[in-house]
Amino acid sequence: MIDLLLQRPTSSDDKYSRGVIGFITGSEEYAGAAILGTTAAIRTGVGMVRYVGPRSVSQLVLESRPEVVLGLGKAQAWILGSGVSKQSIEQNAQIAQLIDDSKAEILIIDAGGLEHISTSFMAGARTILTPHRGEAVRLLERLSGESAARVEGSELAEAVQKATGCTVVLKGSKTLIASEAGVLECAEAPAELATAGTGDVLAGIMGALAAINFDEVAGGKAQLTDIAEAAVSVHTRAAEILAAKGPIAALDLANAVSQALVSLRN
């Protein structure tokens, strides 16, 4: 399935058939999250990237990636929350509105976006959550009203999945993917990935693959777990390529995604 999801574009493709992804990410405090995610998505091969955020961050995104389109618009997948703090009032309102209004888009919800997940969340069947352990524990405690400090690994991923109805990607040295079918343990990634911003890169890869393969997911030929697994594989391969040369920086990781795709396709 991963081979199918990572296929190269064909001569009949255009920028729209290659998928459109939207980002509501980054903030004045964490502007880099927007640059890392959009760069990773572009390097994954998505046809168009939209970005919604503060004016200062939007300017930084355009300076880094001039192909990005600013503002809301049609997209097959949305990345919500990476680098968005509680103080980002306008972005949080936009995230809440998009979650309420979206009917078919695939949602990848990360970091600050997880605050919008409640017991009444209704879009679990088309949503992937991407917490690290601390975020997963806080989310589970908020939803259950009980302490989850001692819940670990597969048990934690499964508990968050059951509480939300979403596909859950619990990030770590061995990333876990939880769905109604159970918990999948991904191959161990290089320890060098434990650095700021690499999760933003993973979200960008995952959203891009969701947009590129939207028709396969909508038609039942692929599941969100397949998208998540493929994204983790690309992320890990990019890290392996860089780790062979030394420490990893998140922007280098985002730019290495193209090379990782070539490696996996071969």
Where are these regions (language model features)?
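Small-residue (G/A/S/T)-rich helix-start motifs and N-terminal tracts that mark the onset
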Residues: 1-106, 115-128, 133, 138-266
